[in-house]
């Protein structure tokens, strides 16, 4: 099985399965000399881990990270960093009823057709459990970006099903299990999820991620554009079915006189481009939005087929998130951070000595809309 590595200079290769003994990743290309402890990584993993509220899977995994290599006396050495997270709360018996059938909406059918074998326990390699090591790697990327460039990567839930969540303040995000930027709407979200769980159904979500402080110049046109790599990484998150950069699909209805972000000596007047022009960062906030589909594992009976091609009815009894989007915010943040650190290192390698006589304008002009 290929396709397990993300990045060019800063690479992350994940390993493991949902119900195996452990999951983890190997990070290659991390710059030496950065202070790093397991506690730095654990902070991010705790934001993603399961069992944190009644609205997510009740699988109780501590997600305690172990750093096996690449750090000596609390400092990165430049050698590969191996992160290990042991699985402790597998309940494989919950999946016995799907050993011979395919769950609608899951990777069961495609994995079987492609590889001729599949680990049906919790989805095996295709499980969202594998986003834990991604978040671990993202914690390292975030730390380096923050300390080296002052870059901050933050995200929030902007919609749960048909409920739009107006942005109020970043401080609200860390105060509720939905990562909602509006505390007043949390009771409505809780009632919505309680009703959904009673129905045995699931729902999708939209997550917005913003990277602030990114310098101008990151990105490698034509085929390694910064926004292309962001979209590639975001689509690597389980259940993501759509990615927008900046205005995204709303650009279709905008006129050029509106969409084109004007430049003034005082800065950019708008940011419909989402901080990327020609595949290269502009110095503005990089804004990304992802659409997450409803969880495929639901208690509602669904039609399917067996491995022999016979008709079957599938009802899933495992412990699942009724909305995987609830825990997706730190995952999306990590993916964006991993792309940014990779492009930061690539830019430094090729263009670190380049200078321009044209002044770099502010990310936002005083009269910006």
UniProtKB/Swiss-Prot annotation:
EC main group: lyase
CC cofactor: FMNH2
One GO BP annotation of this record: amino acid biosynthetic process
GO cellular component, one term: cytosol
Known EC number: 4.2.3.5
Annotated function: This reaction introduces a second double bond into the aromatic ring system.
PANTHER family per the UniProt record, alphabetical: CHORISMATE SYNTHASE
Subunit-structure text: Homotetramer.
This protein's name: Chorismate synthase
Gene name tied to this protein: aroC
């Amino acid at each position: 099985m290929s396709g397990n590595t993300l990045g060019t200079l800063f690479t992350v290769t994940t390993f493991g399965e949902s119900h195996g003994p452990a999951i983890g990743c190997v990070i290659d290309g991390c710059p030496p000399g950065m202070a790093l402890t397991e506690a730095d990584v654990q902070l991010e993993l705790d934001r993603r881990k399961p069992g944190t509220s009644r609205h997510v899977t009740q699988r109780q995994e501590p997600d305690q990270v172990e750093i096996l290599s690449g750090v000596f006396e609390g400092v990165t050495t430049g050698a590969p960093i191996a992160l290990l997270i042991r699985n402790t709360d597998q309940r494989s018996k919950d999946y016995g009823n799907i050993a011979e059938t395919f769950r609608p909406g899951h990777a069961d059918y495609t994995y079987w057709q492609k590889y001729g074998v599949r680990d049906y326990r919790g989805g095996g390699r295709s499980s969202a459990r594998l986003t834990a090591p991604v978040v671990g790697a993202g914690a390292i990327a975030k730390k380096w970006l923050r300390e080296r460039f002052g870059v901050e990567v933050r995200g929030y839930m902007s919609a749960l099903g048909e409920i739009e969540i107006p942005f109020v303040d970043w401080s609200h995000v860390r105060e509720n299990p939905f990562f909602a930027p509006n505390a007043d709407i949390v009771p409505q979200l809780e009632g919505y999820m309680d009703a959904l769980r009673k129905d045995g159904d699931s729902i999708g979500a939209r997550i917005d991620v913003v990277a602030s402080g990114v310098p101008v110049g990151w990105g490698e046109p034509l085929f390694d554009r910064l926004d292309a790599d962001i979209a590639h990484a975001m689509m690597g998150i389980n259940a993501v079915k759509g990615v927008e950069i900046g205005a995204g699909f709303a650009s279709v209805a905008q006129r050029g006189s509106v969409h084109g972000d004007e430049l003034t000596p005082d800065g950019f007047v708008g940011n419909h481009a989402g901080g990327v022009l020609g595949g290269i960062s502009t110095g503005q906030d990089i804004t990304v939005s992802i659409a997450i589909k409803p969880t495929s594992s639901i208690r509602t009976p669904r039609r399917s087929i067996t491995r022999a091609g016979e008709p079957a009815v599938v009802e899933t009894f495992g412990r699942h998130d009724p909305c995987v989007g609830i825990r997706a915010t730190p995952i999306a943040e990590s993916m964006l951070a991993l792309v940014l650190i990779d492009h930061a290192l690539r830019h430094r390698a090729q263009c670190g000595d380049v200078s321009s006589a044209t002044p770099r304008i502010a990310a936002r002009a005083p009269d910006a809309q």
